[in-house]
A protein has these predicted regions:
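Conserved ATP-utilizing enzyme core subdomain
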Residues: 4, 8-32, 162-254, 316-317, ...
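Conserved non-catalytic scaffold segment of RNase H-like nuclease domains
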Residues: 22-59
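Phosphate/ATP-binding catalytic cores across multiple sugar-kinase/actin-like superfamilies
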Residues: 63-71, 242-265, 314
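Glycine-rich phosphate-binding loops at beta-strand->alpha-helix junctions
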Residues: 88, 265-283
Length: 340
């Protein structure tokens, strides 16, 4: 799994079992960090033309293969590799989404079956192509009322009687990391930078009034929306201290998320944002529900874990995309399967 916050490539080896319900055990997990050159390349890829993207994809597939081969060197009995790829474009309302790395060549290089490209079919069926994690939340984390992931974006899975509703709430680390970069930091460790700042009321008001927050689910966000809506607003306040801007944006995140959880009992929090102590303290301020943070492996690797599960469902031809979540015309089993 390669996320929008560009931390690197998350790999997990998971053992799934099913008796009455699905269960899992993470046998091995590791994040392979991107070099500064790859971070720059991937962050700017949406600005390139189709030929340039194809050329980068060839190199990216080789990079994926290198990481996967290293990761699996001491593992036996692997059934398949399930890969999300790295998102370049995600504009489902325009009818397209693109993740690079989803090629038959990767299967050949790693000498294993590959399940990939989980989003395209959903978009073709009129869906948002996101979020896809809720099917995993439904089967693997049944003991929680809902699941909140704080990654590049905040997304949530909410059970609604016989079906699941899920959507992207707001941008999180994809914005916070950029602000932290201004201080020479990769990210705002434990939210300390935000904690030291002060609220900019005018900026908060402008953020709260963005049209996306008035839309009803299904809905999803991409980097294009952040570049078009969030960064221009933040740029208007560049004369303010970065501590004040990151404080205000963190406050905004907590307000948006807090408004979702008025009637839920227990919320599982995963993703890098679960380590942002200041953000978590604000969430507790804006919502009275019980937030639970699981063991570090699940916090860091839940998305990779669930994309492995999506691959398992796909190879067994079971539903792995829920129309109640994405808005597609029907539930379906999504993903391309390639063999070496």
């Amino acid at each position: 799994m390669s996320g929008t916050s560009l931390d690197g490539l998350d790999l997990v080896c998971v053992d799934f079992k099913k008796k009455k319900n699905w269960d899992f055990e993470i046998l091995k997990a590791k994040t392979y960090s991107y070099s500064s050159e790859w971070k720059t390349c991937l962050s700017e890829l949406h600005l390139q033309n189709s030929q340039q993207i194809k050329e980068v994809e060839k190199d990216y597939v080789n990079l994926l293969a290198k990481f996967i081969l290293d990761f699996k060197s001491d593992i036996e009995g692997i059934d398949f590799v399930s890969s999300h790829g790295h998102t370049v474009f995600h504009q489902p309302d325009q009818g397209f989404t693109l993740q690079i790395g989803n090629t038959p060549q990767l299967s050949k290089l790693i000498a294993l079956p590959l399940i990939c490209d989980f989003r395209s079919q959903d978009v073709e069926l009129g869906g948002q192509g996101a979020p896809l994690v809720p099917i995993g939340d439904l089967h693997l984390f049944k003991s929680y009322s809902c699941c909140l992931n704080l990654g590049g974006f905040a997304n949530v899975s909410l059970p609604q009687k016989a079906q699941v509703t899920a959507f992207d709430i707001c941008a999180v680390n994809i914005v916070l990391n950029v602000l932290a970069n201004e201080e020479g930091l990769e990210y705002d460790s434990e939210g300390n930078l935000a904690r030291a700042g002060h609220l900019i009321p005018e900026l908060l008001s402008a953020l709260e009034n963005l049209e996306y927050y008035q839309k009803k689910a299904p809905k999803s966000l991409g980097i294009e929306w952040v570049n078009e809506k969030i960064f221009p607003l933040l740029d208007q306040y560049r004369t303010n201290l970065v501590e004040d801007r990151i404080h205000t944006y963190t406050y905004h995140i907590a307000k948006q998320i807090g408004s979702i959880f008025k009637n839920t009992d227990s919320v599982l929090i995963t993703g890098g944002g679960a380590k942002n102590n200041y953000l978590i303290s604000l969430l507790n301020k804006f919502s009275k529900v019980k937030f639970s943070i699981p063991d570090p492996l699940v916090v860091d690797f839940k998305e990779a874990l669930i994309f492995a599960f999506l691959g398992l469902l796909r190879i067994e031809n079971q539903v792995n995309c829920l129309s109640s979540v994405t808005g597609a015309s029907a539930d379906h089993s999504s993903g391309n399967i390639f063999y070496p």
